[in-house]
Amino acid sequence: PIIYKGNLLDDLFNIASVVWLMVALAAILTLTIIYFITLGEMKDAQKLKDNIYISDKVKTPAVYGIIKPKIILPTEYDANKLNFILMHEKAHIKRKDNFIRLLTLIVVCFHWFNPFTWLMLKLLYSDIELACDESVLSKCDEAERKEYAYTLLSTAEKTNLFVASFGGCKIRIRVEKNLYYKKNFHLI
């Protein structure tokens, strides 16, 4: 009689399933730890007004939180750039970008093995920043657009996974889109 080694395929599937689950759980655990560390750092932030806070723990302006989002500014920020920064961060809040970021991070945790998932994450984060830039630019004249581009350049820093940040995305792309921005005209 012929004996098939069908158990080998079952064993490989079981091993792959366990590896997938362990990596997914490790990723979720890592993100949870990062989230609580970030949350702890934000407890020391001082309230300026409404949902705007200042903290020495952040390097660039950012929005923290999903249910009650807070705009966190670094202690050393330029008051001349504050209007642009607040417009940008308020666009993140209005668009619920932190919720979208959280959902995409969860997707990446479960699809960590797929390189297209990582590409999607990178492109989505870039698009989020560009959409907020466009929201700000739609309210600016040409001189203000140049000032906004300068503001982007001066606040460029690495950002946190969980926050929508003014300094996120590739700054060169954002500045170029900023300088060549054309307002959309609607006929209706």
What are these regions (language model features)?
Residues 1-188:
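Membrane-embedded and juxtamembrane structural elements of multi-pass membrane proteins
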